[in-house]
A protein has these predicted regions:
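Glycine-rich phosphate-binding loop of ATP-grasp-fold ATP-dependent ligases
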Residues: 147-148, 166-191, 217-218, 240-258
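ATP-grasp fold ATP-binding core
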Residues: 133, 161-182, 201-213, 291, ...
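Phosphate-binding site of ATP-dependent enzymes
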Residues: 165, 188-244, 295-307
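A long amphipathic alpha-helix within ATP-dependent nucleotide-binding catalytic cores
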Residues: 201, 243-303, 341-342, 346-350, ...
Length: 371
């Protein structure tokens, strides 16, 4: 029987932006990856394994799994070469993670081809979110946000940002608020330098009008055998630059009710979004995928941005979705956060469920705050 092995590589968006297979994450990103490497255990299939940094983390995964009645086991990097009949499920696929696994001794035939990795990179380009927007717009009468525009010339970007103060300028390969410029003052040298640098590296930029935000949420999917399966919903908060801040943890029904209370047509739009994901992504991609969406105020009317971005990978929203549905006691609601502490975490706080191990050298942790 094929053994499924999950792994956490949160730098995958940056690896896709870099291209090729030689991206090296900065030290802080490597540290975060090591400290939070157990996160996939919360959405991994029963009987699978999670790649962790060392023996101490493996013991934490095994003991936590046993305590909760899971059948998840940890595996350390030095054991990967022995996985002769395994399928790998990284946080996200790229040429970089493929090369890292091969370097650890994983047989190349167990991994996707280089052509498949290039296909993933092309699908991760933000212009496919424009295709999503058009697909949904053609199949609904609901009022939706303006469709983003892609430009390959700085003057066109500047003209757009000048006409639409507060717009968002986005690099084609980026995610979770990274590679995004909130253009409050587009006439500055800083704005010009950022845009021209991004155009040189990634050849185009996507421009979106700023919206009066009401609620950030996402639909979480799994793509398999050419079809997209809706796993659930996530509701989260983002900062001024659209970077993920925290997420609500609760049952699938509770999260649905939060969104539907502000946007009753959620029931009608969800099948259309699912169809769009199947049509645009699932034919050439297998794995997790999140569609970030936005409710916004337009002159007193609540409207929908149906595709702020598509994350072609697992997401923190997937973690909150699965934990809320399968881990928290019925009726319990919490808030998911990732915390950094330069001095570590010598004292575990009450009213927290820690989703990653706290060890003497831990500086990043993921937890659910209760109460």
């Amino acid at each position: 029987m094929t053994q499924r092995i999950y792994l956490f590589n949160p730098d995958n968006d940056l690896a896709l932006a870099h291209g090729g297979g030689h991206y090296i994450a900065p030290p802080f990103a490597q540290k975060m990856q090591n400290d939070l490497c157990a996160l996939p255990m919360w959405y991994a299939e029963p009987g699978s394994m999670v790649l962790v940094a060392d023996e101490a983390m493996r013991e934490w995964v095994d003991s936590t799994s046993e305590r909760l009645g899971f059948t998840i086991k940890g595996i350390t990097p030095d054991s990967l070469a022995k996985a002769n009949d395994a399928s790998f499920c990284p946080w996200g696929w790229s040429g970089t993670i493929k090369k890292r696994l091969i370097k650890r001794g994983v047989k190349a035939h167990l991994l996707p081809s280089d052509a498949a990795m290039e296909q993933v990179r092309l699908l991760a380009h933000r212009r496919n979110s424009i295709a999503m927007h058009h697909f949904i717009q053609e199949r609904t009468s609901l009022p939706l946000s303006p469709v983003p525009v892609e430009y390959d010339d700085f003057n066109e970007v500047l003209d757009f940002a000048t006409k639409h103060p507060g717009s968002y300028i986005k690099m084609p390969w980026s995610g979770s608020g990274q590679g995004v410029y909130h253009a409050i003052e587009p006439g500055t040298i800083e704005f010009e330098r950022w845009c021209k640098g991004a155009l040189k590296r990634q050849e185009s930029l996507l421009c979106e009008v700023g919206l009066d935000r009401i609620l950030d949420f996402a639909l979480e999917f799994k793509c398999e055998n050419g079809k997209a399966e809706l796993l659930g919903y996530s509701v989260f908060e983002s900062d001024f630059h659209s970077q993920y801040n925290s997420g609500i943890v609760g049952s699938k029904q509770h999260l649905y009710d939060i969104i539907a209370s502000k946007f009753p047509p959620l029931h009608d739009i969800t099948p259309t979004v699912t169809e769009a994901v199947s049509h645009i992504y699932a034919a050439n991609y297998e794995g997790f995928l999140g569609v970030d969406m936005l409710l916004y105020n337009d002159g007193g009317t609540t409207k929908l941005n149906p595709c702020v971005e598509v994350n072609l990978r697992a997401t923190m929203g997937l973690v909150t979705c699965m934990v809320g549905e399968h881990i928290l006691p019925k009726g319990t609601v919490g808030r998911f956060k990732i915390e950094y502490s330069k001095s570590g975490f010598p004292v575990l706080q009450e009213n927290r469920i820690y989703l990653t191990p706290i060890l003497p050298d831990t500086h990043y942790c993921a937890y659910i705050g209760l109460g």
